[in-house]
Amino acid sequence: MAIRLNKVTKLLNVGLSTIVKFLQSRGYLREENPNTKISPEEYEILNQEFHKDKHVKLDSEKLSKERFQKENYDKDKLKQIEEIKMGIPRSNEFQLLLTSKLDLDTLPQDKSQTTIEIKKTIKTSEIKEIKRENKTDILKERKQIEEIKNSYLNKQQKKSNLLSSTDSTINFTITGKIDLTTINNATRPKRKTKEEKQKEREERNKKIVNIKTEKTTQVNAGKKSIASTQTNIEILKRKKRNRIKHEKVNIEQQNISTIPNPKNKHFKFHKPTYKNEVSEEDVQKQIKETLAKLTNSSLKKGTKYRKEKRDTLLQLKNEQYKIKTQENKTIKITEFVTANDLSKMMNVPVVQVISTCMSIGIMVSINQRLDSETIDIVADEFGYKTEYVSAEAIETIIDDENENQEKELVLRPPIVTIMGHVDHGKTSLLDNIRNTNVIAGEAGGITQHIGAYNVKLDDGRKITFLDTPGHEAFTAMRARGAKITDIAIIIIASDDNIMPQTIEAINHAVAAGVPIIFAINKIDKHGANPEKIKETLASMNYLVEDWGGKYQSQDISAKKGIGIQELLEKVLLEAELLDLKANPKRYAIGSIIESSLDKGRGYIATMLIQNGTLKLGDIVLAGIYFGRVKAMFNERNLKIKEAGPSQAVLVLGLNGAPQAGDTIRVVKTEQEAREIAAKREQLQREQSLRTQKLLTLDDISRRIAVKNFHKLNIIVKGDVDGSVEALSDSLIRLSTEQIQINVIHKGVGQISESDVILATASNAFIIGFQVRPSLLTRKLAEKEGVEIRLYSIIYNAIEEVKSAMEGMLIPKTKEEITSNVEIREVYKITKVGSVAGCIVKEGKIKQGDKIRLIRNGVVIYTGELGSLKRYKDYAKEVTQGCECGLNIHNFNDIKVGDIIETFENIETKQKL
């Protein structure tokens, strides 16, 4: 179960920033927000790291608890001692009972001999053994003596009242006489002398000793009946006892609860109980014992059956919950899904998906399709499981592996991809090899498509070259080129450094497991330094053969043809080591390089045959499209009837433009191709529905928080699929927090009327890359007010969209102080108000400027300048060092010494 960071900080006794930094170092990207929730796995990692701080907190709490208990115990102890000193009465009761009855008829006539025997009896159950082990027992004994005296006096008084109410025939013995003449002679009794007080004190002490001696004798005799004694005790007072000193007891060490003595009923207070800290093992042991007691084996059959039924239902519910949770974490996808679609299905930012791919050595873009292996790795990183719904459609294609028999395999030409940075000489190298001028046909002299060419050398051997764009927008193209190639030539200009696109191309080749040959170009140019390039490669862990490494390299000049033959020899040598073979007699399998829509010929696709032979009339299946091969052309636009392994051809006859990177296969019948294509199209529609993300409350809140939020809708049309994908990818990456770019539609071919209607409905504009609208489309766009922008170089398209985004941003307002004026004199003029005579200290004051009145460093008023005069004439401006007169619009509270500051608000254009 997820737990918030603020709770984790309290549990682990660690600061929030420390926890966030630790999680970020472990790869968990977290914002420093106390309300952010973390998973149980992350909490377990934090617990392992900061368990020491947690124990420190627990120990501190334990010490404070013990200190608090000790203080409370000391307070209770002092309170009890005070109560004892105050003489709180105990529950002991002493009763005076008549031991016999007097027969009044048989009494002698002599009343003087009538006596009364007062017997005192004490309940035997009240006499307990007195132990003087500590101070508490001593205090108890004192209290008992005091109670004996008090209860005796009370009973004596009751007895006297009882006797006074008896029959008058009872005779009493006269023991003494009172002189009534001495009573009430004075209002106050006479003071006793010291000798009399001392005598009375000694008598009282003797009687107390007699009582104690009698009580001690009775206790030592055991639990026998105590004989009543005939006493005539006067009012007693207690003498202060000698204190018996005992050793001090350490309360902290005495961690055992005090158990009261059952024999002593006067036990009134208890020492505080100190319990030991309960360990986790004791708790678990106690739980097991309790469960064992509750689980009675001798239950009735009905009770046992109901219990088993409840357990079964609970287990079934838990299993259903687990299955439901697992289904929520399972995403159903097709095999070649784009990184953007995958991020939407997992509900994570696309940036995290791309960074995850880069961490495993795979360079991807937003709209680049991922293979099943990469999808599995990325989904597992975010805790999702994948289920490929297109497996059924793929399995319907029977790939007869038996056709790949050893005797039918023949050597095939190597497929070589030329990769590198912009303007490092990739196309120039290919021109020199083919003896043509490809660059002349490219806009801006920059390659913007994957070019596939077959080259036949002088000795009859063939090589298929793929020329990839070097611009950063064509990352997906380079990745596709690396996947379908056998050997990669990385071309580097010797007068330049190793650029980011060069490193990216090397990473693509290494990720695809393709052998690399480095071609260091422009060695004929002034300032060329091939050794510096080799040194840089060595620092990147790519050691060339000249430096004792395993990577081949060749210094060349693409313009002058220096080192070209040596480079081709190394390519063929590498191909021989790879032992590239294919079976030309089986059904063709290949990859789509580019696809486009030609007005006269329909949908055309450039494909590279990897195995088998493609013939005219074959039924091909590529992605969700299918068709019969109507015509095939080579790279020189010449018709051919068949294409063997490692050959690039242009195919006509498909019913749509398949995506670059799709696999093309030959199937037996058109019916089979139609069924598979329909099934794939259905799966693709389901996929698009899953990736549609509706506007949520969080999105609305975010847009409200980011003020002036804008959306820019774009429709992209291009000549080939690869260029459209690259341009769309680059435009989506321009999105910011304030402006979101949505490519609502992209496709190949001419800009049509349906594109204009879609742009009208969605308030979008159209970007055409090397395509033109028809005449009717242009008129409809003018009528509907839809803007169509046409480009032939990808740089220009990206820069203009960026400028349009900057124009949508609200300009920043910057305040600039233009002058500083000091008031020297103030004049009061009727119907005008206060006029200030000033001198311009700094800058230039102008008519109509906004002003700020400052007095003693505090802004008093902000407003506008009313009028400005130089001598007697109105002035448009007054420069530094000159005197002037002015007044402030609707404000007259000005004083000598005030400072007037003029300023302007300048708006500056925001940049992305």
Curated annotation (Swiss-Prot):
Residues 411-581 form the tr-type G domain. The keyword RNA-binding does not apply. Residues 467-470 are annotated as: G3. Signal peptide: none annotated. Residues 185-204 are annotated as: Disordered. Its main location: cytoplasm. It is found in: Cytoplasm. Residues 521-524 are annotated as: G4. The keyword Ribonucleoprotein does not apply. Residues 193-204 have a biased composition (Basic and acidic residues). InterPro entries: EF-G-like_DII (IPR053905), EFTu-like_2 (IPR004161), IF2_II (IPR044145), IF2_N (IPR006847), P-loop_NTPase (IPR027417), Small_GTP-bd (IPR005225), T_Tr_GTP-bd_dom (IPR000795), TF_IF2_bacterial-like (IPR000178). Residues 445-449 are annotated as: G2. GO terms for molecular function: GTP binding; GTPase activity; translation initiation factor activity. PROSITE patterns: G_TR_2 (PS51722), IF2 (PS01176). Residues 420-427 are annotated as: G1. Keywords: Cytoplasm, GTP-binding, Initiation factor, Nucleotide-binding, Protein biosynthesis. GO terms for cellular component: cytoplasm. NCBIfam families: IF-2, small_GTP. One of the essential components for the initiation of protein synthesis. Protects formylmethionyl-tRNA from spontaneous hydrolysis and promotes its binding to the 30S ribosomal subunits. Also involved in the hydrolysis of GTP during the formation of the 70S ribosomal complex. This is Translation initiation factor IF-2. It comes from Azobacteroides pseudotrichonymphae genomovar. CFP2.
